[in-house]
Each structure stands twice: as structure tokens, then as C-alpha cells.
């Protein structure tokens, strides 16, 4: 990795960039999940209005991942969200982490997740958790980052191919 990686907190002025980045990154990786071209989900999850709604939630924080000052990804953290079944831990959820395909394999994902660990620790969190598609190559990445599987979840989106609706719930203890 030659160049400067930067991760910064987003604000509402970043919504347009976040929306475009989310749609592009999602479609580069997850189109196989859908019976359509993924438009139903991306229109629902990554619209300007949806990002505005999520920015209005004081528990949510977005971070832009930049390489040489160009956006290559983003993360969404839910600062105070216990993992069901593990409520005795002060936990943070890594709800979304998306990187452009062109940024894959360069260590940016590892740096972004390490940033999340440090950020969670700065907020005195004992655990960070996430959900990942059970058909995703990301599961191996998360296990290398120290996450362990603690449960399963199933999405109920009718337009999603049934064989790809499974998710794994993963957690990492920080203390």
C-alpha cells in the first residue's frame, strides 16, 4: 500500500458521496444475492433519504475510508447496541463495512476493522459485533480478525434468492 489511508467521521454533507459509494461497492460484490439486479435493496438501503434518516439517529456514526484523499469505502457503527443474548457486555455493532472492489486485497479492510476496534475501545466497549452473509468470503476475513461465530440470522426479503438469505452473527471481545 503506497499512499495515505485516512478514516474520518462523516457528517450530513457526505450523504451524496456515501450513497454513491454504497451502491457501487454493494453492486460490485452482492448482486448474486438478488433476483433483480440488486436495485430493490440499494434503493431501499442506500438512498439519500435513508442515509438522512440514519444520520438523524444519535447512536449511529459513519466513517469514510479514503486512500490518497479519494473515498474507497465506509463504515457504519451503532455505538450502544448490545448483542442479543450477550447484553451483559457493553457492545458496539459494526453494521456496515463496504470497500470498493478496487481496494480489495490491499490491507484496507484490515485497517478499517482495526480502526473500529480502537474506536470501540475509546468508547469503553467490551465487545464489537456484526452480521455477515453466510455465503460471503468476508467470513474468513472476520475470523482472521479475531471474530467468532455466536449465532445465525435469516433475512426475509422476498426478492432475495432463498439460498442466500442466511447470515452469521460474529463477535469479538475487546477486553
Segments predicted by a language model, with ranges:
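Conserved N-terminal entry element of GNAT/NAT acetyltransferase domains
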Residues: 1-16, 173-175
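Conserved GNAT-fold acetyl-CoA-binding loop/helix
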Residues: 26-53
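A short helix-loop-beta-strand connector motif used in the catalytic cores of GNAT acetyltransferases and
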Residues: 46-63, 93
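Conserved beta-strand in the GNAT
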Residues: 64, 70-79, 93, 98
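A short, internal acetyl-CoA/4′-phosphopantetheine-binding micro-motif in the GNAT/acyltransferase core
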Residues: 97-104, 133
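Conserved acetyl-CoA-binding loop-helix of GNAT-fold acetyltransferases
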Residues: 105-118, 144
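Conserved GNAT acetyl-CoA-binding A-motif
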Residues: 120-131
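Conserved catalytic-core motifs of GNAT/GCN5-like acyltransferases
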Residues: 129-131, 143, 148-165
